[in-house]
UniProtKB/Swiss-Prot annotation:
It is found in: Cell membrane. Signal peptide: none annotated. Required for induction of competence. It comes from Streptococcus pneumoniae serotype 4 (strain ATCC BAA-334 / TIGR4). This is Transport protein ComB. Residues 1-20 are cytoplasmic.
Length: 449
């Protein structure tokens, strides 16, 4: 190698392979690159706080319905219940006995009304419609009614028989008197004929009743005026006596001919008897209807009191217990026992609730993106992305300062809903914006938010 080339190589090494070219220049280039990157590249700015999974809505507040002791308690945190499931049962008081008493009384009154309606139908139709002997005596009442109606019929029949007998006797007496009248009239005619024969001197038939008197007159001498006067006087005396008897007979005849009317009020008597019984039945039915209403009202009241002796689920859902009453065996009426949340699987969404210090709340707004990460199981974490849906207008005061309540509603997949539980705690990251790295570190250095 030529000596001049060696000199050039040594010069080159001395010129370009010194400390400045080996360290300072690369460092300067790296610094320029980092400064350029820090100026151009951006960092997401976020806030982090604790958050819990809450329901998107509350289905029902489960309150204590009695001051009595709790005998059965099926309330459990995050327990899935169906509509109608028994949750709490209290010790029964006097309302249980009262309810049974009203129920028994109501059954008896309804049975009594049914039997009374059988009596009403039997009275209306005159036939026994009772399927069996009743314990209220209504069938016996119907039998008494039938007996009374029978007595009325028998009495009327007997009365009519007596009247018929009396009428027959009156008719017979009248006929006999009529015969006497006819006979007396015939006798009077005979004596009148005899009188005429004596006075005129005519002959008299032998079958005439006064023929013997006429013969006696004839035998004494017709020419003797005194005899004729005596004979006429005797005949007139007989006629006068017969006419007196005839007048008496006619009076008797007129009195004996009266006929008594037969008893004709049986139908009205029977109808009156039926009406009396039906009116009484109607009154009893009205009273029974009132008693039934009172018993039903009492039973309903006692039933409501009994219903207060147990608490059931109003619909399907998940239980969240009130920690203040969950371990108590006696809870005041009206106190909150638990809340019923919708099932996450069926609802398909949940609400994330967090509290943020008042010094950071100005950096977030409704609509900002958030990410929730579960922390209870590091090996099986869940990540939920959502946006802020509400920020409380006023802060909640605590010992650690003032905090604002933040809520974010998120939709869940079926897999997420199956793994998630109400009340699970996690970390909630809120994306508040972006800064260049240069600006970020500058703010950190200057202690700016």
């Amino acid at each position: 190698m030529k000596p001049e080339f060696l000199e050039s190589a040594e010069f080159y090494n001395r010129r370009y392979h010194n400390f400045s070219s080996s360290v300072i220049v690369p460092m300067a280039l790296l610094l320029v690159f980092l400064l350029g990157f820090a100026t151009v590249a951006e960092k997401e700015m976020s806030l982090s706080t604790r958050a819990t999974v809450e329901p998107s809505r509350i289905l029902a507040n489960i309150q204590s319905t009695s001051n009595n002791r709790i005998l059965v308690n099926h309330l459990e945190e995050n327990k899935l219940v169906k509509k109608g499931d028994l949750l709490v049962q209290y010790q029964e008081g006097a309302e249980g006995v009262q309810a049974e008493s009203y129920a028994s009384q109501l059954d008896m009154l309804k049975d009594q009304k049914k039997q009374l309606e059988y009596l009403q139908k039997s009275l209306q139709e005159g036939e026994n419609h009772f399927p069996e002997e009743d314990k209220f005596g209504y069938q016996a009442t119907f039998r008494d009614y039938i007996s009374q109606a029978g007595s009325l019929r028998a009495s009327t029949s007997q009365q009519n028989e007596t009247i018929a007998s009396q009428n027959a006797a009156a008719s017979q007496t009248q006929a006999e008197i009529g015969n006497l009248i006819s006979q007396t009239e015939a006798k009077i005619r005979d004596y009148q004929t005899a009188k005429s024969a004596i006075e005129t001197g005519a002959s008299l038939a032998g079958q005439n009743l006064a023929y013997s008197l006429y013969q006696s007159y004839k035998s004494q001498g017709e020419e003797n005026p005194q005899t004729k006067v005596q004979a006429v006087a005797q005949v007139e005396a007989q006629i006068s006596q017969l006419e007196s008897s005839l007048a008496t007979y006619r009076v008797q005849y007129a009195g004996s001919g009266t006929q008594q009317a037969y008893a004709s009020g049986l139908s009205s008597q029977l109808e009156s008897l039926k009406s009396q019984h039906l009116a009484k039945v109607g009154q009893e039915l009205t009273l029974l209807a009132q008693k039934i209403l009172e018993a039903e009202s009492g039973k309903k009241v006692q039933g409501n009191l009994l219903d207060k002796g147990k608490v059931t689920a109003s619909e399907d859902g998940v239980l969240h217990l009130n920690p203040e009453t969950s371990d108590s065996s006696m809870v005041a009426e009206g106190a909150l026992l638990a809340q019923l949340y919708p099932s996450l699987e069926r609802e398909g969404k949940a609400k994330l609730t967090a509290y943020l210090s008042s010094k950071y709340v100005a950096r977030i707004k409704v609509g900002d993106s958030v990410r929730y990460t579960t922390t209870h199981d590091a090996g099986n974490q869940l990540f939920l992305d959502s946006t802020i849906t509400s920020i409380d207008a006023t802060a909640t005061k605590t010992e650690k300062g003032n905090f604002f309540k933040i809520e974010a509603e998120t939709n869940l997949t079926s897999e997420q809903a199956e793994k998630l539980r109400y009340g699970v705690e996690g970390r909630l990251q809120m994306i508040t914006g972006k800064k260049s790295y240069l600006r970020y570190y500058l703010d950190q250095f200057l202690n700016k938010e």
